[in-house]
Each structure stands twice: as structure tokens, then as C-alpha cells.
UniProtKB/Swiss-Prot annotation:
Name of this protein: 9-beta-pimara-7,15-diene oxidase
Coiled coil stretches, renumbered: none
A single GO molecular function term of this UniProt record: oxidoreductase activity
Induction: By chitin oligosaccharide elicitor and jasmonic acid (MeJA).
Key word Ribosomal protein present: no
Compartments, as annotated in UniProt: Membrane
Amino acid sequence: MMEINSEATVTLVSVVTLPILLALLTRKSSSKKRRPPGPWNLPLVGGLLHLLRSQPQVALRDLAGKYGPVMFLRTGQVDTVVISSPAAAQEVLRDKDVTFASRPSLLVSEIFCYGNLDIGFAPYGAYWRMLRKLCTVELLSTKMVRQLAPIRDGETLALVRNIEAAAGGKKPFTLATLLISCTNTFTAKAAFGQACGGELQEQFLTALDEALKFSNGFCFGDLFPSLRFIDAMTGLRSRLERLRLQLDTVFDKIVAQCESNPGDSLVNVLLRIKDQGELDFPFSSTHVKAIILDMFTGGTETTSSTTEWLMSELMRNPEVMAKVQAEVRGVFDNKSPQDHEGLLENLSYMKLVIKETLRLNPVLPLLLPHLCRETCEIGGYEIVEGTRVLINSWAMARSPEYWDDAEKFIPERFEDGTADFKGSRFEYLPFGTGRRRCPGDIFAMATLELIVARLLYYFDWSLPDGMQPGDIDMELVVGATARRKNHLQLVASPYKPISMQS
């Protein structure tokens, strides 16, 4: 989330040369009382140069090693505090949760989420609380997850068939391409139901893919709020607005079809709530679109990238692969595919593998930024109202201070059950915690577990000829999620063709 948009970087260099802006950009923060320690800041750009040396989560971890787990960094004009310890994270996300429960307004979310009407970036308040309740009770509940089981079953079996076709002749293929297609199609069918035909669905996903390309960091105006006009001058804002309009055009057609074809899709559920008019706030089709867009941005790439990281870790650790595959096959053998989802609860070791994958490869290395709503203290330091707060979950999850053999892939470390997805241990926050915790973990895990189980059951996996486990690079790139920079190439050999069970 701290990646700096390349266009913003170029613009930044240009602006630095304009002396007329010097006085504006070098204004000092009015409060220095017990401010957290931090690295040096330059006039104009603050501490942005510290983030250009390596991946942001890595650079911030290294800086925290010198300046402490509560660290101040001025990013452009924005005062930012970086949290890198479980104790400080607990203060922010539990003890003073309400104080840090809001979000800053960022250009991309402002435009694509219809003025931050989505649950991810809506400012904290009565509207957001209503939205959160609507999502947890209606859209992302255990009941809704069960209701979507037939779609999950169908799309994950389709994934297996697509892998069988791609792996013909034991040729290496790119697993990520098929995973993304599977998760996109599942989310589209869950969101839109049968009302959204193949062509309309494809138009929506194409437009969404273009939009997500802009989700890889902060825009210039996000770092220099008084200079937001720069984003308009460079044409960035107009490009984002054109993309939103393109997405909106397809979205409106889908919503219209859902309105004329009542069903149980997520859009239909929201439309019924809209028509009932029982909410405390005006609720229109625009709100419906903002919520559904969150489902795609927060769900599809999350599941596909996590699965690819998991397969990467298993290929690097053959003994873990053998153990988890034996468990899955022991449970699934001689069972109908229609029974697979009901048997997932018996795959205890596979669940540990997923947990360990999310420890080493969190979906968001830096949790979505929080906004301090009133001046308070964290770790004995004053955090001023309006400060952005970043939680470096990646750094805590890989710290030898909190984990034995922190860099090794050891699923057994979770056997004691003390770490869960709800934030029971603050050094492990794959979905965040507190009020702004991701509400879709049950929804996401149901799909992720079935995909992983079927990949392990139906195929034996190997690396391309001449490649060894140690040759797999684990370099990441941060966009909407942290995904592999170079997609994994694998060879799949059918263990038991799906046709034998169908």
C-alpha cells in the first residue's frame, strides 16, 4: 500500500525544482511534544527517499530496527506513524480502536468507490457502522457462505478441468492465470447470479482489471494534499474517471438485469434492502455498486495470489507437500466431489499450511492505512489528530523476536491454536483486527480451502525440468495485494482424473 505510483515519482522530481513551493512544503508540524523518533526528513519530500531503496515493508522494518516500533515518518506533506510491534499494534487496533478507526481519503478509492462509499475506505461513523453490519449479517455471513457452496463446487471443479487441459503432455504452465480466472468467475457468479451473462461478465472483469492497475500505491495528491491539482494537471484524475465511467457503464447494465431478474445473488440481496428502505441512511444503486466493487478488489486477487504463494511454499518444501497431500487424499479418496466441501473440516494440517502461508506472505504487508481521529498516546509518544498510521504486519510476522525460525516454512508452529484469523495474537494479522478488520475472511477462506484441497488431491506437482526447489524465487510486487513478481510455472500430473469421480 506504500508503493509510490511511478507517475507520481516523476511529477515529484519536477515539483522539487519549483522554489515557489518551498515555503508551502517545508512547514513544520505544530506539535513536537513526545513525537515518535524517526529517520531524517528532507525539505519538500520528507522521508520518501527512505522508501525507494527496497520494498516499502522491508524499508520500514529496517528503519524500525533503528528507531523503534513506533516510528514517525513524513511522507511528503503527510505525517505518518509506522507500527512494528505487537504491543503497539494492540494499542492502535484494540485498546484505542475507535480513535484509529477511520481511513484517509485516497484518490483511487475516492474515484472508484464512488466517494468512499465502500466498507474498506468509508470514514468511520454511523454510515460505516451500518455498512459493516449489512456486510457481516447479510452478505458475508456463514449462511451466505453455505448458500454459495454450489457455485464454489462448480468453479473449483472447472479449475481442475482447466488444469488437466493446460497440463497435457506434462508441459509447464502458469498456474496464476487459471487461478485468477477461477476466482473472478466465482465472485462474479456470487455477486451477479445468472443475470450476468458471459459477455457482460467479461466486459466487467476487463474493466475491473484495468482499474486495479492503478491500485498499486499512492498518487501524488495523496502524499501532497495541498497539491492535489497536480493529479489533474498530469491527466491522472481524468484517466481514473474515464476508467470508472467505463466500469460504471457495465455495472449499470448488470444491476438493471438483476432488478428485472430477482434471485439470490449478492446484488439482488442489496437491491431488496434498497427497495425496503429500512436503513437509517439513503441507500441507492451507487451504494450497491461500491459494496460489490469491494467484494472483487478484496476477494478475487486475494484468493488467487494466496494460493500461488501456498503452492510456491509447498514446492520449496517437499516434505510439507508430501504430508499435506497425504492428508487430503486420505480424506477425499473414494468420496464424491460433491462431498469435498463438507470434508474440509477434517483437513487440519492443510489449515495449518494456509496459516503459515499467510504468515510469510500476507495479503497486505502493510495493513490499509488508519487515520488518527483525535490526539492520543501510543507507546508513550504523542500521535496527533490527522496522522496516518501504518501497521507493518509483514515485519511482525517475520520477526525472530516473536517466531522461532521466523524465515522458515513450518506449519506445525500453529498447532497450539493460539493464533487465529481474528487477531488473537497481534504479531499475526493476515486479515487485520479491530473495527476495520476485513469482514470477508469466512467468505474468502471457504473458497481458498476448497481450491487448495482440490489442487492437492487431483494432481501431483513438479517443477520444470532442471529446476530445483531452491531455484524458486519469492520476489513480490505490491499492487491491490502482495503477489509474486514472476508467476509460478509448474507441471501437473493427474493423480485421479476428475472424470473417474464425476
